[in-house]
């Protein structure tokens, strides 16, 4: 007995412990069920209302206390409000904990209600209940509810995902078990076909009873829309509102309403992007999300692991974003790539001749030539075929080891003859001196594509004597400008090289309607609007000859990891999470619980079939398909790229075998193709099946013939994606089979595993067309997959460590921004800013005159102490004294501002208030004019105090947004520059953490300085009014009393950036919605030149007040 088995025998294994914890809950549900089953239809719905009331009342005292504190906040001095808000925050947290206890108490009854409702819908075509207002509202838009008199009739069939669906599901005991796991904030791993979607109805219903909102997160919009339509009626029957954010435009009222629903479905990206958009909003009306309460993530491994490498980014235009060099430098790169192709072919030809020689030296030269050909173009098909021959790859790897010895000391000898060097594993392309010479050509500047040693040049300049400071500064600027230009040129060349050598059309991307669109490697779907980052997308656009889009700058960013960690409670479900249980616990503190299957799995999983070449493999795949079709079985063929799908489709067409293709180019037909995939003799080719096969149902004839047959044409980098493909067969105890066809030329095998298997095949003397099938081989492939998974986990963990630094900063900035936006805590924040500024003025200035100047520049005040006091008093005391005077000045100025604005506000509101909603007030700080928009009614009722609040809010939002945008750019530059620290044996992450603190402190100081300076100087510009000016004062700019326009987000684009490669995959989703420009309109009617003058003089306007117009 091993040590682990010994421990398990004492403490029990993980599954046993989970069962012990969850099973008592299932027993409680089963005990409560008979009482619920006795209720009539109206009684069942009334029970739901009873539970809602019980949960609401459980925290009624705490809610009343929080409301009381909020109501009295205006009577509390600004300096003392922080303590009150801290109390409110504490009570809010207590309410959430009380709700959790109440939910646990009602869980058995709530789960019983859902189960009984599902049972009644499955047994009755119609359910009759007493109509409520909610029923009547639904009946106007939904065809599964109709009203007859005082009765509402609910049907048990409706449209879901484009298909008519009849409800025929009731929860099994194992699904109740899964529901408890999800409610407890854990991950439920359930085999495919065990009804994950139905399981989710239990915790979703229960947690929606609080009214705080439940988010159901899916991997794509098809599933989000389908699940909201499929499960929605079950929730709606009990008066719970359901919506899907993907049905509505971003930043719209409809999307805001979707978030206010009790249950909100949507895709992970859209939830994340909405959060970022909310933190760019300029009015509370622009916000769509409410608090992050509870989320259930479907395909949780795909969302929290696969997508976690890709930060969400909202970017906007940058100055001179159109000035790019991609089209200009493309011909040079094409010449470079063509020259490299000729060279790679020449070396491969040499290698083939020399390797077969009897002379040992010639054989060594042959393998060196082969290694050079591999470094030149590793994806060359002729090279890949030659490497699959007996002993060839092993010989090349030995040669590589020789040149890699002593930290790549001799590697340059092997790579110098090439124009550039490709490293597939590191996703990198490096230009050699020979390559630089080729593209420089006859240029006057031989260093056109060579980056200068800027540090050495600046050091030389500093030590240069005989130059004035001004001359040194001029030379320094010239050096830095030259470096920036060359850096951009070299970067563009590198990105173009990557585009030409490492990214293939119809594999990583497709070109549709003159646009380059990325294909998701996990799902095979087009990632609409996403873009690769760092100029790579523009490079591919230049390569494909389509329009090169303008460059962009990051305005807001977050990783999905940090977004989902904001939820009060998070849980998830998937068919394949156990292999990633460690990562899910490390990063999210989510425990994986494996749910037992309702019926034993009857699928037969066969060992991998390994061939030497892709050609042999695909031939064998077609033959296997032909045999299965003849046996009357449906076949699902999983591929890893669009290109392979199309090639197999052509091969099947030549054999006259009917089939359907499901990939990035044909995803519109998805629902139809998936629905037919279980019919006898049907062949379906699908590019990656993650979250796709949920609808493959089998007929009795198909089950008798052996069920659905799964054929994988290649092993994926992740074992989980392979398990998802296998899991499409053998649902609910159905028969089925799965097998993977692998060749030594596949990317995974080529990069990580094939040398060992190739040597086995060589020793056993395998000929072309023969295949090897053994458990040992399948295990070897699995080890290669583990290697890749570990590497990817490292990347994700590293990304998270970098983003954690930014996340702390983002939390502080977004909290401060939300305070400004909502206005509730803005006064408290401004008081703190003024205090910080006063303390900094005393702390940072050793000289009295400098301190005086600092106070004058930022706080617009004289120093309230003498030079002697400055030298002798304690700094704390001086800061307190300065703060008291600054606050007195600030209050006096804001009161004066309100006094000046009030007569105008009063006049406009009393004369034309019924016509207009907002008014624009011009305020200046002496440097620039700010037009402050303010609600007219609120300004009138508060005697213009609302004008002051709007001024504070507008300035703070403006300063925070500009400073944060600049900080993001600096952090981005810092992340790239610290990577060089590894050459000095330092940890780049550590340097990044230290430097980012300095950047953040500088940003906070800048926000404080700018905000306080503008607020302290802010005033409405007034002068002694002339008759004309008095007339103009009456023409105040106001907004019409129509519904206020929402913020225009159309100039921003959303991106997901894949950090698998430092440059890689930023993607961008353009919100193409046309937004109406928010133009203020005039309060008065426009007076024509020949109309009577409005002053009442009786003269024409052109001869009276219009004389000077």
UniProtKB/Swiss-Prot annotation:
Cell compartment(s), UniProt: Cell inner membrane; Cytoplasm
Cofactor note: May bind 1 zinc ion per subunit.
Annotated binding of Zn(2+), by residue: 1093, 1095, 1104-1105
Keyword terms: ATP-binding, Cell inner membrane, Cell membrane, Cytoplasm, Membrane, Metal-binding, Nucleotide-binding, Protein transport, Translocase, Translocation, Transport, Zinc
EC class of the enzyme, as a word: translocase
Signal peptide: none
Lipid bilayer topology: Peripheral membrane protein
This protein's record includes keyword Membrane: yes
Residue span of region Disordered: 1038-1109
Protein name: Protein translocase subunit SecA
Gene of this entry: secA
